[in-house]
Amino acid sequence: MVRAKRKLDHIEYALSTGQSRTHGFHDIDFVHQSLPNSNYDTITCETKIGELSLSSPIFINAMTGGGGEKTLHINEQLAYVAKHHNLAMAVGSQMAALKDESEAASYKVIRKVNPNGIFFANLGSEATIEQAERAVDMIEANALQIHLNVIQELTMPEGDRDFTGVLQRIEKIVLNSKVPIIVKEVGFGMSKETMQQLVNVGVTAIDIGGQGGTNFAAVENERRQRMLSYFNNWGIQTATSIIEATSTNNNLSFIASGGIQTALDVAKAIALGANTTAFAGYFLRILMQDGIEKLLDEIELLHTDLKFIMTALGAKTIEELQSVPLVVKGETYHWLMQRGIDTAHYSRR
């Protein structure tokens, strides 16, 4: 009951605290192309995360589940949206259903709605091999997200305080999983050092989950009597984290998430090196406040606008979009220079 109540609290406070939009994409400018040699009607948006082929570089990221009928209904609607637009979708942490079988329906509903969809299971880094297998089987998942949420746990009144052995547990799951593993942050970004550690234990796909979207420190602080306000601005911005990711020069698939709301955000994230982008809080807000039809329309417009931007840049495919010239400036540039990451290659390609 406590876990289910927390799930509902997260939805309420995620909506009320909003998104900060401090993602850093305002520091990224495309180099205009007056002769793009492109045709809107022939632009294609297919992409891949590792070996998983996706029809769109937009997917519905982990949001909820395990909070009774309300979370079941949300996942049911999101699965319908995913089916309508042929998008991949992740569920929220399934630990609730592993602890209480009665909550499993709030996750399993997605397969009922969209039997042939691409779905990602989701667990925290405390998960065991056996729990990972059960989570995947629960929704017949195509991949498993393992989320890293140290700051959220520390801010959460009833959260974990021991984070020893996390990398070793992830390595065991990677070695024993029958589906690909995606390690993701939850709004605080990932450093190049963290990503290198994950690569070293066999991880091949990462969702950088940058600062700029739903702020889970702020969400958990709403649930505390004594706020840990020093965590409210903690983290690495989304744009910065993508560039940190690409600087590792590893054969990783990168998912960009954290405050992404527009087609321009999507295009910039991909041009910086992401293979795909993920939306959570923005989609949830539209669904809860304006309804499912509005969300369906918004996703249609996102795809239309992304193709307009790709046409302007002369990028006929997502792969070509990853190599268009752009300039990194402002605070993002200064952060990266201090970190020893040269951005000049982006502007000269």
Swiss-Prot record:
Keyword NADP assigned: yes
Organism domain of life: Bacteria
Main location: cytoplasm
Biological process annotations from GO: isoprenoid biosynthetic process
Location of the protein in the cell: Cytoplasm
Swiss-Prot/TrEMBL keywords: Cytoplasm, Flavoprotein, FMN, Isomerase, Isoprene biosynthesis, Magnesium, Metal-binding, NADP
InterPro entries named among the record's database cross-references: Aldolase_TIM, FMN-dep_DH, IPdP_isomerase
Reactions it catalyzes: isopentenyl diphosphate = dimethylallyl diphosphate
Record-listed E.C. numbers: 5.3.3.2
Example of a GO MF term: FMN binding
Residues reported to bind FMN: 62-64, 93, 122, 184, 214, 258-259, 280-281
Positions bound to Mg(2+): 153
Entry GO CC: cytoplasm
Binding site for substrate: 6-7, 152
Keyword Cytoplasm: yes
Co-factor requirement: FMN; NADPH; Mg(2+)
Major enzyme class: isomerase
Family: Belongs to the IPP isomerase type 2 family.
Known function: Involved in the biosynthesis of isoprenoids. Catalyzes the 1,3-allylic rearrangement of the homoallylic substrate isopentenyl (IPP) to its allylic isomer, dimethylallyl diphosphate (DMAPP).
Complex and partners: Homooctamer. Dimer of tetramers.
HAMAP family found in the cross-reference section: Idi_2 (MF_00354)
Protein known as: Isopentenyl-diphosphate delta-isomerase
Species of provenance: Bacillus cereus (strain B4264)
Lineage: Bacteria, Bacillati, Bacillota, Bacilli, Bacillales
